């Protein structure tokens, strides 16, 4: 289903035993080989030894590393310097200060999340001022609030997982529906910008 609808990214949770979606580095290498070349593979890590994301980025298995632990600036810069590949750093947003901390990150992209994971509840979007740097939005985003999330915060990308599942497994029907919906929203947003320019 993923290859059929071609989302921009496909995320793989790597060596995170606490996640039910956990995969080994070897499993990811196999899955990525079957991924359409237009889809960028992203490895999701939580406080991994830096050698793990570095090796998968260097061998071409991954386009980017998405970090969800307590990785500091030194860790982020080490991955960037040793691979030349993008780093996405996730931040739990509970206060305006959390947003400012995220904006100061040396990561190539920041990911704004509600932080507790899997609750299906978004964080308070009013905490996010207009953001100039490209960011990913995650946490509690699904069919019912996707349009509002994009029109309110204008993220560069949205990170979806639980909302694409049925009984804990990725649902091909939901994946198709949400990608179609995202493409419609993006077309509408582009149309609005064109009209604003013409006025």
Segments from the language model and where they lie:
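Conserved N-terminal beta1-alpha1 strand-loop-helix module at the mouth
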Residues: 1-199
């Amino acid at each position: 289903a993923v290859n059929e609808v071609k989302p921009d990214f496909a995320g793989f949770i790597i060596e995170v035993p606490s996640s039910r979606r956990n995969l080994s580095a070897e499993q990811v290498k196999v899955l990525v080989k079957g991924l359409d070349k237009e889809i960028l593979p992203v490895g999701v890590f939580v406080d991994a030894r830096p050698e793990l994301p570095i090796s998968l980025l260097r061998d071409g298995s991954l386009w980017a590393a998405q970090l969800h632990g307590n990785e500091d600036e030194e860790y982020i810069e080490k991955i960037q310097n040793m691979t030349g590949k993008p780093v996405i750093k996730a931040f739990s947003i509970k206060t305006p200060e959390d947003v400012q901390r995220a904006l100061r990150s040396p990561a190539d992209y920041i990911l704004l999340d509600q932080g507790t994971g899997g609750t299906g509840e978004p964080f308070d979007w009013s905490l996010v001022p207009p953001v100039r740097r490209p960011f990913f939005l995650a946490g509690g985003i699904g069919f019912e609030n996707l349009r509002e999330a994009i029109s309110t915060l204008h993220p560069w990308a949205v990170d979806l997982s639980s909302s694409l599942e049925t009984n804990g497994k990725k649902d091909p029907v939901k994946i198709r529906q949400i990608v179609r919906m995202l493409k419609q929203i993006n077309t509408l947003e582009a149309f609005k910008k064109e009209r604003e320019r013409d006025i």
